[in-house]
């Protein structure tokens, strides 16, 4: 998927928490292990590796190692150059696209003054409007929409200046896309077992 995205000039990639975990770990795995370098492997690094493996990292590294070194380098460069947010304007409205949310948010604060981590892990309060203008929308993933919607359905959530598009595909929900120009939504059913109440609760 990443290599397909790299070939498309009309795809703008926004870095997320799983990408950040991958980059953190792969930088260390790429270093040849010697008696000197092994001393630099900290407890934090081992915990980061364990966390990454627990979040799907094992299959990722297996696929990554099957690539040639030039292909690996191209992917790493692509990920490292990714932005943490994008801003799009359409019909006099501003859409701010981030992976997770904006931690330490202040409506007076410029986006380029936040730390990268502020965009990667934070789960917004979807009952709260972040920007005072009704023409500014925060578009997020990361938090499965069944955790947000009152009906707990795996559908895109729109409300209070938020557009949340992570519909829990990996947990049996939907893969979703939202068209900013038209407001239309598009869905593909997950190949996983259907999303259950238990799976939803486990993501809280």
Short names for language-model regions:
Residues 44, 51-164, 168-174, 180, ...:
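Acidic, His/Gly-enriched loop-helix segments that form or flank divalent-metal centers
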Residues 2, 38, 114-115, 204:
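Extended hydrophobic/Leu-rich segments
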Residues 1-44:
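Core catalytic region of metal-dependent phosphoesterases/phosphodiesterases
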Residues 191-204:
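A short, highly charged, low-complexity intrinsically disordered segment
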């Amino acid at each position: 998927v990443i290599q397909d995205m790299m070939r498309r000039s009309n795809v703008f990639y926004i870095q997320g928490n799983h990408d950040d975990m991958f980059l953190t770990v792969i930088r260390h795995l790429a270093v040849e292990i010697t008696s000197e370098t092994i001393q630099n492997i900290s407890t934090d690094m081992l915990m980061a590796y364990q966390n990454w493996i627990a979040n799907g990292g094992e299959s990722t590294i297996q696929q990554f190692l099957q690539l040639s070194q030039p292909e690996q380098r191209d992917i790493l460069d692509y990920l490292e150059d990714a932005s943490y947010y994008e801003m799009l304007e359409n019909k006099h409205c501003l859409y701010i696209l981030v992976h997770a949310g904006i931690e330490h948010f202040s409506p007076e604060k410029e986006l380029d003054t936040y730390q990268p981590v502020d965009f990667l892990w934070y789960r917004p309060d979807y009952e709260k409007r972040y920007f005072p203008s009704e023409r500014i929308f925060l578009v997020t993933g990361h938090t499965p929409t069944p955790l947000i919607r009152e009906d707990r359905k795996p559908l895109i959530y729109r409300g209070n200046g938020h557009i949340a598009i992570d519909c829990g595909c990996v947990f049996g929900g939907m893969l979703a896309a939202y068209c900013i120009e038209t407001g239309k939504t598009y869905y593909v059913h997950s190949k996983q077992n259907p999303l259950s109440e238990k799976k939803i609760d486990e993501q809280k």
